[in-house]
C-alpha cells in the first residue's frame, strides 16, 4: 500500500536523533498515525465491498511519515465517483 524511498530514509536516519522531537513534531507524528489508520480502514473496507480506491501520497510522504516533522495536516483523501 505504501512505497518508500529507502535510500533517502537511510541518509536521514543518520542525521536524526529520534529523542530530540519537539512537541510540534510529536503532534505531527500522532496525526500521521491517525491518518494512516484511517487510510487502512478505508482500504480494508474496500476489500470487503469490492470497491477500489486510489490513495495517492505525495512524493515526500516517506519523509513525513518517518520524521513526523511536516505534512501530517496535508494528508487527506479526496473522493470521487468517477
UniProtKB/Swiss-Prot annotation:
Taxonomic path: Viruses, Viruses incertae sedis, Bicaudaviridae, Bicaudavirus
Annotated protein name in UniProt: Uncharacterized protein ORF82
Bias (Basic and acidic residues) ranges: 18-27
Annotated segments matching region Disordered: 1-27
Amino acid at each position: 500500500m505504501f512505497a518508500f524511498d529507502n535510500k533517502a530514509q537511510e541518509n536521514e536516519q543518520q542525521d536524526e536523533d529520534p529523542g530530540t522531537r519537539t512537541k510540534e513534531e510529536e503532534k505531527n507524528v500522532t496525526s500521521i498515525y491517525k491518518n494512516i489508520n484511517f487510510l487502512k480502514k478505508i482500504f480494508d473496507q474496500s476489500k470487503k465491498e469490492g470497491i477500489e480506491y486510489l490513495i495517492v501520497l505525495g512524493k515526500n510522504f516517506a519523509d513525513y511519515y518517518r520524521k513526523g516533522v511536516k505534512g501530517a495536516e496535508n494528508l487527506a483523501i479526496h473522493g470521487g465517483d468517477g
